Swiss-Prot record:
One of its GO terms (biological process) is tetrahydrofolate interconversion. The modification N6-(pyridoxal phosphate)lysine is found at residue 229. CDD domains: SHMT. This is Serine hydroxymethyltransferase. Catalyzes the reversible interconversion of serine and glycine with tetrahydrofolate (THF) serving as the one-carbon carrier. This reaction serves as the major source of one-carbon groups required for the biosynthesis of purines, thymidylate, methionine, and other important biomolecules. Also exhibits THF-independent aldolase activity toward beta-hydroxyamino acids, producing glycine and aldehydes, via a retro-aldol mechanism. Keywords: Amino-acid biosynthesis, Cytoplasm, One-carbon metabolism, Pyridoxal phosphate, Transferase. GO terms for cellular component: cytosol. It comes from Acetivibrio thermocellus (strain ATCC 27405 / DSM 1237 / JCM 9322 / NBRC 103400 / NCIMB 10682 / NRRL B-4536 / VPI 7372) (Clostridium thermocellum). It comes from the Bacteria. Pfam families: SHMT. It catalyses: (6R)-5,10-methylene-5,6,7,8-tetrahydrofolate + glycine + H2O = (6S)-5,6,7,8-tetrahydrofolate + L-serine. Homodimer. Signal peptide: none annotated. Its cofactor is pyridoxal 5'-phosphate.
């Protein structure tokens, strides 16, 4: 599919690396929960001369001339995003999910203000107040987490912390939480203490769009997301809000934290949003959830522990402590048999973030290839064989992975 002739002429080293990466994606089982395979149409949109165009500002209010056609594209992206999520306003310019989050912070907070966000080690995200992130350095961060007994969000703790610390902003949403999030409960708590509520749905946006997870738009003052992951668009960010906050959000994105938007990426966002609005996309999301539940159940049947005992969405966290293994080691041996996962901390993890006691597994990418429930049972068996009998099984597992990838070809 990919014609690298022009790149090969100018830079054969980069062309070769691209070819190797495409083949890696084709020939390995991709189980990283935050990764996905975009359509050829989305890839095509990103590779257009739209990358040549500067368009600081917003449609109809640009600081550069010659924006009449990129205005059409950005307006299409905006209107489609609003339709998908039922929002009054959408800003499609953030370059990433982290940029979308920082724009909301920039809009409503001053340095030193208090935010209440989910602890990274309990499933939150770097940009929700981690001390190593900008959000944790510029603001006073209070963290909530999950209950030790069931690894579910402790809404009583959230309420208690909110009343004690009176945050200006409460952040809901996660990067490694396999259960439904109660957005109404978060809004009730925010209202009790007079806080703004921001919900980051980067991981679950596709499920929300398909009606498979509650929509935070009716409850949150601000909703942020990436446009990749389950939404299966290009790498980028998106902010949704009501009309009353539209101007402050737009000003926070530009000129607040960004300059010129990436019009080739915004075009790809528009294309992917058109895909989201189809019946096929809804069916795809339904299959993601079916596959995740099947994979989770198959792993547990083999004696592999999952944090919270399963999943409601597209991902699961494997707790490896009962196997006496670390996430770092299991990520490595699975990669050796062509199965890609990421090491991940689990709640109350005794290991460091560089080692971890868990791995995170997701089904968006394998579902995009066309895999179904029976393939999840096979993948569970391959993971179990690798974890329990790596040296004796690795060649057989690699062959079974090869056969599975050939059955569901990618980017032909």
């Amino acid at each position: 599919m990919f014609n690298l002739n022009e790149i090969s002429k100018i830079d054969p080293e980069v062309a070769k690396a691209i070819e190797l990466e495409v083949n890696r994606q084709r020939n390995k089982i991709e189980l990283i929960a935050s990764e996905n395979f975009v359509s050829k149409a989305v890839i095509e949109a990103m590779g257009t001369p739209l990358t040549n165009k500067y368009a600081e500002g917003y449609p109809g209010k640009r600081y550069y001339g010659g924006c009449e056609f990129v205005d059409i594209i950005e307006n299409l992206a905006i209107e489609r995003a609003k339709k998908i999520f039922g929002a009054e306003h959408a800003n499609v310019q953030p370059h990433s999910g982290a940029q979308a989050n920082m724009a909301v912070f920039f809009a409503v907070l001053n340095p030193g203000d208090t935010i209440l966000g989910m602890n990274l080690s309990h499933g939150g995200h770097l940009s929700h107040g981690s001390p190593v992130n900008m959000s944790g350095k510029y603001y006073n961060v209070i963290s909530y987490g999950v209950r030790k007994e069931d690894c579910r969000i402790d809404y009583d703790e959230v309420r208690k912390l909110a009343k004690e610390h009176r945050p200006k902003l409460i952040v809901a949403g996660a990067s490694a939480y396999p259960r439904i999030i109660d957005f109404k409960a978060f809004r009730d708590i925010a209202d009790e203490v007079g806080a703004y509520l921001m919900v980051d749905i980067a991981h679950i946006a596709g499920l929300v769009a398909a009606g498979l997870h509650p929509n935070p738009v009716p409850y949150a003052h601000f909703v942020t997301t990436t446009t990749h992951k389950t939404l299966r668009g290009p790498r980028g960010g998106l902010i949704l809000c009501g009309n009353e906050h539209a101007k402050m959000i737009d000003k926070a994105v530009f000129p607040g934290i960004q300059g010129g938007p990436l019009m080739h990426v915004i075009a790809a966002k528009a294309v992917s949003f058109a895909e989201v609005l189809t019946d096929e996309f809804k069916q795809y999301q339904q299959q993601i959830v079916k596959n995740a539940k099947t994979l989770a159940n198959a792993l547990m049947e083999k004696g592999i522990d999952l944090v919270s005992g399963g999943t409601d969405n597209h991902l699961m966290l494997v707790d490896l402590r009962n196997k006496g293994l670390t996430g770092k080691y299991v990520q490595h041996i699975l990669d050796e048999v062509c199965i890609t996962v990421n090491k991940n901390g689990i709640p109350f993890d005794p290991e460091s973030p560089f080692v971890t006691s868990g791995i995170r597994i997701g089904t968006p990418a394998v579902t995009a290839r066309g895999m179904k429930e029976e393939d999840m049972v096979e993948i569970a068996d391959l993971i179990n064989l690798t974890i329990t009998d790596y040296e004796n099984s690795k060649e057989k597992v690699k062959e079974r992975v090869r056969m599975l990838c050939e059955k569901y070809p990618l980017y032909q």
